[in-house]
Amino acid sequence: MVYLKGQIRKALSGFYYVYADGETYQTRARGNFRNRKITPLVGDEVLFESDNLTDGYVLEILPRRNELVRPPVANVDLGVVVMSMVSPNFSFNLLDRFLVSLEYKDIEPVIYLTKVDLLDEPQRQQVTEIKQIYEALGYAVIASEDVEATKELERFFPERLTVFMGQSGAGKSTLLNQISPELQLATAEISQSLGRGKHTTRHVELIPLYDGLVADTPGFSAIDFLEMEAVELPKQFPEFVAAASHCKFRECMHHKEPGCEVKRQVEAGTIATSRYENYLQFLMEIENRRPVYKKKS
């Protein structure tokens, strides 16, 4: 048996397709992974053994930098948050959920706004507002419908593993098809009853694009903060981190404490009210969630 190091590019029906040295190997996971309740993920760097391209075994998963649950991908560098301006309507709350989740996983976010061409002039003011708020925080915001927008996005891909996420029905599959027409991914219809897109993507696969790898992923429109402790939340807001050194209390949660610099900057208009209100809502969600009890093994 030959021992090799590679990366899982696709997982399907119990098989893991591992890319190594220009070849793709079909492998299975050894039974001891199941016994240890470890599941190999797309994006994992692995050690595996194989004598041919169809009968390999994954032996070891190398340490992960991060992992996402939805979609199940490991070692992600860049998260493109695709947000629709209309149908479904734009939501500051949802965008901030995605950004907080990415910051927590140490994944660089890029904000991509779709359906900008459907807006009238008053609605376009919101695009300007979004750009002002988030570019000031250091986030890239792409907001146009032409070839230039996809070109702007492509410059982020080289040497990175990129995941697309965002509102269901916001146009993630459409966007990926524009970037790489050979993908021919199914695009979502908007559900009349929910006002949200129906999920069209079924399994995750890493596709080599522009000297990087891109995962096509389901478009979930709700994110919860199951893993995060309340004290971690303020650290995921860059503007809070910058202000916190001037708060009266070192572990200030920017809620009820006196002498809070974050609250002062919100009142002064330096920190966006929408960001602070969303922070308070997320904080309440974390504090009110039921404890997760792990079963004894």
From Swiss-Prot:
It is an enzyme of class 3 (hydrolase). It is found in: Cytoplasm. GO terms for molecular function: GTP binding; GTPase activity; metal ion binding; rRNA binding. The keyword Repeat does not apply. Pfam families: RsgA_GTPase, RsgA_N. One of its GO terms (biological process) is ribosomal small subunit biogenesis. The keyword Zinc applies. One of several proteins that assist in the late maturation steps of the functional core of the 30S ribosomal subunit. Helps release RbfA from mature subunits. May play a role in the assembly of ribosomal proteins into the subunit. Circularly permuted GTPase that catalyzes slow GTP hydrolysis, GTPase activity is stimulated by the 30S ribosomal subunit. This is Small ribosomal subunit biogenesis GTPase RsgA. It comes from Enterococcus faecalis (strain ATCC 700802 / V583). The gene is rsgA.
